[in-house]
Design a protein with these regions (language model features):
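Non-catalytic cell-wall polysaccharide-engagement segments
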Residues: 1-41, 100-193
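Short, solvent-exposed segments of well-ordered alpha helices
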Residues: 8, 53-57, 82, 109
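Short, well-structured alpha-helical interface segments that form or flank functional binding sites
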Residues: 16, 58-61, 82-85, 113
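Short, functionally critical alpha-helical segments immediately adjacent to catalytic or ligand/cofactor-binding
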Residues: 39-48, 54-74, 118
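Generic alpha-helical secondary structure signal
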Residues: 61, 89-93, 117
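Amphipathic alpha-helical interaction surfaces
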Residues: 68-73, 93-97, 121-124
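Short, solvent-exposed loop/turn and secondary-structure capping segments
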Residues: 76-81
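Substrate-binding/active-site groove segments that recognize
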Residues: 82-101
């Protein structure tokens, strides 16, 4: 399993978090990986043409960029006066509602379980809304559940970091395809045979 760049790579538990996220993305996160959100070009230009491995790498990077703004990469973080827990600040009742393995505050402070739960949530909301962070009268996609995505400055910070990653590069050549011989022959006044 190739380990993609993540924004949390400077943290001691980063490799375990990345592996947990990749495992979840290959299992219950498959609907997330299959979806090409309508706003993906602003986040990761190469995503739409990328293979599943590249798409999973994007989501790991996305989770790590979101964790910067949710918990400053602290798996044991508790916010909202004891309401939200872990790397991605998940409410235990939300975790239970989505069928996550981690359903208590204590369990959600396990980095891998928190990420697995976040992927379970996003695997429902991103395909449902076909979006990462779109506001068409109400917030859609990941932004429906995670507040940092409602901040233009935080979205810009996350998207800028993600666009700089190798897994977000466009992998197909922008060079135009050659025209079929039959079209070139017709254009020069001769009929193709």
């Amino acid at each position: 399993m190739e380990i993609p760049n993540a924004r949390w790579d400077h943290r001691p538990s980063s490799a375990a978090w990345t592996r947990s996220a990749l495992t979840a993305l290959a299992q219950h996160g498959t609907p997330l990986v299959r979806t090409v959100p309508r706003d993906i070009a602003s986040w990761c230009p190469g995503y739409a043409s990328g293979e599943a491995t590249q798409r999973r790498a994007f989501w790991v990077g996305f989770l790590s960029a979101l964790a910067k703004h949710e918990s400053t990469y602290r798996a044991k973080a508790v916010g909202g006066g004891g309401l939200w827990y872990g790397l991605l600040q998940i409410l235990p009742s939300t975790a239970r509602g989505y069928g996550c393995k981690a359903t208590s505050g204590g369990a959600l402070t396990n980095g891998g379980d928190n990420l697995s739960c976040a992927i379970r949530i996003m695997a429902r909301t991103v395909p449902r809304d076909n979006a990462i962070a779109v506001n068409d009268g109400r917030w859609r996609g990941v932004a429906a559940d995670w507040g940092p995505l409602r901040s233009a400055a935080k979205r810009a910070d996350m998207a800028s970091w993600l666009r700089g990653q190798e897994y977000c590069a466009i992998t197909r050549s922008p060079r135009p395809q050659l025209r079929p011989k039959s079209i070139e022959t017709q254009r020069s006044g001769r009929t193709a045979r």
